[in-house]
Amino acid sequence: MKMNRFLLTGCAGFIGSHALDLLLSHGHFVAGVDKMTYAADEENIKRHESNPNFKFFELDICDQAGIKNIIQENNINCIINFGAETHVDNSILGNNCFIDSNITGVKSLMENCKDLNIPICHISTDEVYGPIKDGSFSENDKLSPKNFYSATKAAAEHIVCAYANTFDLDYVMVRMSNNYGPRQNSEKFVPTIIRSLKNNKKIPLYGDGKNVRDWIYVEDSVKIIYNIIQFTSFNNEVYNVSLCDERNNVEVIQTMLDHFGLEWGDCVEFVDDRLGHDSRYSITNHKMLHLIDFKTTSFEDGIR
């Protein structure tokens, strides 16, 4: 069955709002849920307030009864869960909200999947694999998270799988690499670079700047996720979502400086490294390649 009536959590956030745009552009009905924390932006949903296929609910995904009412009243036939706390630095300062949203919130959603027999697309992260020195992780590799954020995301995956196994539920799991693009919260690396350059301030660079991440433009990411939802029949599988575009932080900054026509010079300030900073994330993308039916965006084009 093709999914056409979605409960979309985190719809006012960075990636979730792009998923909202895409779902509505395909004519689907979306009941959007967002707790409206600092990482959400009202403008991300305002543009759709006159669309009859969109309803917005300011709600915490931990509110199991509230979510259940939304699902029942709007004939939802699929949940897409982007709702999460995601900033690693924040998880080091305090991890209670990460446990609430990323673990308890997922447990709440899975209770509704069980009670109402609804499939879920759970959005996770490549960070659940932990760092890797050489090679890349595939979907079958074990999880070995090394920070509080990735630990809560790994726990959430286990909760989804446990519910599915125990109660015969359908799901699909997506492990994304580093997204960037329009609407990203200012705390993230690429927006920090842009903000620093525009304000004539130095770009803070952790450690030696050699930490490697795998970058993907947000609109490419949500298109792939949409195709996973529509064409994989919720087969209780995991899909890495990556374009295998690995760059260390120095290279990312240099690309941004080239874009703005600036020299390295005094633009960068090396700062103390993040506690427990993972050196490199890398995932394979063989499993999802056949789902890319569009021209993907290079990093150089994505930052324009």
Predicted feature residues:
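Glycine/proline-rich active-site loop of Rossmann-fold NAD(P)-dependent oxidoreductases
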Residues: A154, D170, N179-T192, N199-K202, ...
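Terminal hydrophobic/aromatic helix or amphipathic segment near a protein terminus
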Residues: H259-I283
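Conserved mid-core alpha-helix of short-chain dehydrogenase/reductase
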Residues: G66, K107-N112, W215, D220-K223, ...
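Conserved C-terminal active-site "lid" loop/helix of NAD(P)H-dependent oxidoreductases
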Residues: V218, V250, R274-K295, D301
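N-terminal Rossmann-like NAD(P)+-binding domain of SDR-like oxidoreductases, especially those catalyzing
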Residues: M1-N179
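Hydrophobic alpha-helix immediately C-terminal to the catalytic Tyr-X-X-X-Lys motif of short-chain
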Residues: A155, I159, Y163, I193, ...
